[in-house]
Amino acid sequence: MFCVAPPESEAKMNITKGGLVLFSANSNSSCMELSKKIAERLGVEMGKVQVYQEPDRETRVQIQESVRGKDVFIIQTVSKDVNTTIMELLIMVYACKTSCAKSIIGVVPYFPYSKQCKMRKRGSIVSKLLASMMCKAGLTHLITMDLHQKEIQGFFNIPVDNLRASPFLLQYIQEEIPDYRNAVIVAKSPASAKRAQSFAERLRLGIAVIHGEAQDAESDLVDGRHSPPMVRSAAAIHPSLEIPMLIPKEKPPITVVGDVGGRIAIIVDDIIDDVDSFLAAAETLKERGAYKIFVMATHGLLSSDAPLLIEESAIDEVVVTNTIPHEIQKLQCPKIKTVDISMTLSEAIRRIHNGESMSYLFRNIGLDD
């Protein structure tokens, strides 16, 4: 695992006052690795708590130490059973609230249901619902990382610190890809062009954008909530009324805007889940002359058979952070590499607990980052 090693004198972060309790809300032990890293960096012990499933699949939380008047930080990483993960967090937050904790800060590196943050036909904005549930349960502050859409912050009526993993990914490129100067940053769809531009400008590299069949289905969102009346029926009711309709979309043939011939292609995105679009992008880049292909993202969901598909694809390496546990996927696919971001989360916890400014963690971050 690639990680930024702090100087020896800074191996343990300085907690200037007492009253900090650090809990992991996961009942799955494989999801606790990040919590242990954060506790080690802060130089504190993990709080004593039991989180388990009853025989009837109900979630039960038993806090086994006093939290009265303390700053409670609850770390929750998303497992495959995302709904159980959410219930574990909500029940633990509510348990701390009823136990008179001074403040309850959720540390949720990957915010679940973040891909459902827009209205799709007769669907719902689920991330807004989840934000309301967290606030209602008693959460007073949220620390997360690289929200799928920054507008999700507005769904909360509590402070939200949306940290960035890009400094760690940029450092990985500079230190682990020897000839990265001959690389080009690639957006696999126009929707991810801003993120690619941010990486390219910081690394002083060129940019390429894939447009066409390989672009995300999410870019084709339909925002209609009700079925519109047929134009003819509307005109029949009001003969003078002719409502103009949008022309149906048609994807153009796949195109790469930018030169990738004889270069390393680095595809950047925030989430890797369904890898079909990444595989199609990699094939296209190979056809256009790219000789090595990297994929970099903050959150490695890697659902279903994604690791096996990556292993058999033209992609040379997939780099993700440890916001989500993926040790099993790494066993299935040696191409998957991990970047440790526990340092940023630990520093955020330390600063919030000590009442220090968070601006240090947001240096040089622009509106498009």
Curated annotation (Swiss-Prot):
Seems to play a negative regulatory role in 5-phosphoribose 1-diphosphate synthesis. It comes from the Eukaryota. Disulfide bonds: none annotated. Pfam families: Pribosyl_synth, Pribosyltran_N. One of its GO terms (molecular function) is enzyme regulator activity. SMART domains: Pribosyltran_N. InterPro entries: Pribosyltran_N, PRibTrfase_dom, PRTase-like, Rib-P_diPkinase. The modification Phosphoserine is found at residues 219, 227, 233. Keywords: Acetylation, Nucleotide biosynthesis, Phosphoprotein. GO terms for cellular component: cytoplasm. GO terms for biological process: 5-phosphoribose 1-diphosphate biosynthetic process; purine nucleotide biosynthetic process. Belongs to the ribose-phosphate pyrophosphokinase family. This is Phosphoribosyl pyrophosphate synthase-associated protein 2. The modification N-acetylmethionine is found at residue 1. Binds to PRPS1 and PRPS2.
